[in-house]
């Protein structure tokens, strides 16, 4: 089952933390829809900024949104103009007091979501899927990853029948829970239809001990 399940979801509570951190009883459904709407809006609005992950924390009447991006300057804007616009636009989805935090991704080449989006962008620019996958994978390995696997599905090269192509370098221990595996998914809109792109990146092992928390985790 290690090959079928989302690698991040499989490791939540072991070496990964939740992307949404809050507790609710009566308002659970409303909060869930609110989170979905905020994430969908931000992902669409900031697509060019290379947003890899959006974390949401709630506490009584406060809402904290943490945006992990490869281009913080694009999100913040000149003199903070863009981030102020974002705050105003997000308030249409929530009535709570909003706190927006931007975190920079230092190495975008080893972030699975950004790698998948990079391959998808190349496919939209009519670059061969093999060339796009192999060049991106070699760049990721040079940046310090211990392993990478990519998959592209759809009408590859305009073929009449859809298929899936996999390429991998290094090791990807999907069923090892202590293995820190990042996962990303993106879609490419081409003249032949949509292509799905998946990326798995292995960063090494993390020992889940009480005193040793993974970087970026609030546990």
From Swiss-Prot:
Domain KH type-2: 38-106
Gene3D superfamilies in UniProt: 3.30.300.20, Ribosomal protein S3, C-terminal domain (3.30.1140.32)
Keywords assigned: Ribonucleoprotein, Ribosomal protein, RNA-binding, rRNA-binding
GO BP annotation list: translation
Recorded superkingdom: Bacteria
Entries under InterPro entries matching the protein: KH_dom (IPR004087), KH_dom-like_a/b (IPR015946), KH_dom_type_2 (IPR004044), KH_sf_prok-type (IPR009019), Ribosomal_S3_C_sf (IPR036419), Ribosomal_uS3_bac-typ (IPR005704), Ribosomal_uS3_C (IPR001351), Ribosomal_uS3_CS (IPR018280)
Gene Ontology cellular component list: cytosolic small ribosomal subunit
Pfam families for the chain: KH_2 (PF07650), Ribosomal_S3_C (PF00189)
Keyword set includes RNA-binding: yes
PROSITE patterns with a match to the protein in the record: KH_TYPE_2, RIBOSOMAL_S3
Example GO molecular function: mRNA binding
Assembly notes: Part of the 30S ribosomal subunit. Forms a tight complex with proteins S10 and S14.
Function, in words: Binds the lower part of the 30S subunit head. Binds mRNA in the 70S ribosome, positioning it for translation.
Family: Belongs to the universal ribosomal protein uS3 family.
Protein name: Small ribosomal subunit protein uS3
Originating species: Lachnoclostridium phytofermentans (strain ATCC 700394 / DSM 18823 / ISDg)
Record lineage: Bacteria, Bacillati, Bacillota, Clostridia, Lachnospirales
Name of the coding gene: rpsC
